[in-house]
């Protein structure tokens, strides 16, 4: 696999403390605020007119929860991310035509949110391991493009 046993330990150790539902909504919300062009995929979600509107939007929270639960399932198949995300890749890439760059952006936002939630515990080693994971997931989601 692309993660060492030690890195897997760091990732799983932190992930076991993550409130997936809460962090998912926050990460997707921040994506839409920080990178406003990503909003075009969510036009059916209602009010995205301001940062406050986005962060409190129930549909954004619900989809963020879904996104992070999928990510969580992916962590259980860390050595076969392509397999774990094949169906989601097909949906997002072939049907919704999401630019794969957006998966990378969301991964980076997730890293920021985890740093924000965990402070000192999210040390450079943990960050490095998570950065590998989000890059791996992004590339698994994008693989239909290659």
From Swiss-Prot:
State which tissues express it. Red blood cells.
Keyword Aminoacyl-tRNA synthetase on this protein?
A: no
- Which InterPro entries does the record cross-reference, listed alphabetically? Globin, Globin-like_sf, Globin/Proto, Hemoglobin_b, Hemoglobin_oxygen_transport
Question: Where are the N6-succinyllysine residues found in this chain?
Answer: 17, 59
Keywords in UniProt for this one? Heme, Iron, Metal-binding, Methylation, Oxygen transport, Phosphoprotein, Transport
Transmembrane residue ranges: none
Biological processes per GO annotation = hydrogen peroxide catabolic process
Q: Which residues carry this modification: Phosphoserine?
A: 44, 50
| Residues recorded with modification Asymmetric dimethylarginine | 104
A matching Pfam family: Globin
Q: How does it assemble?
A: Heterotetramer of two alpha chains and two beta chains.
Q: Which family does it belong to?
A: Belongs to the globin family.
Chain's role: Involved in oxygen transport from the lung to the various peripheral tissues.
The name this protein goes by in its record: Hemoglobin subunit beta-2
Organism of origin is Panthera leo
Q: Which gene encodes it?
A: HBB2
């Amino acid at each position: 696999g692309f993660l060492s046993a030690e890195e897997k330990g760091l990732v799983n150790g932190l992930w076991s403390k993550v409130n997936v539902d809460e962090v998912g909504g926050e990460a997707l919300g921040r994506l839409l605020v920080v990178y406003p062009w990503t909003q075009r995929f969510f036009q059916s979600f209602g009010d995205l007119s301001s940062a406050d509107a986005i962060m409190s939007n129930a549909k954004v929270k619900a989809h963020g929860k879904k996104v992070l639960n999928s990510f969580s399932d992916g962590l259980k198949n860390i050595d076969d991310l392509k397999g774990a995300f094949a169906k989601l890749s097909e949906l997002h890439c072939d049907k919704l035509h999401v630019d794969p760059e957006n998966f990378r952006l969301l991964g980076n936002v997730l890293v920021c949110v985890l740093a924000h939630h965990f402070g000192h515990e999210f040390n450079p080693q943990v960050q490095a391991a998570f950065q590998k994971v989000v890059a791996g997931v992004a590339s698994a989601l994008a693989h239909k493009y290659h």
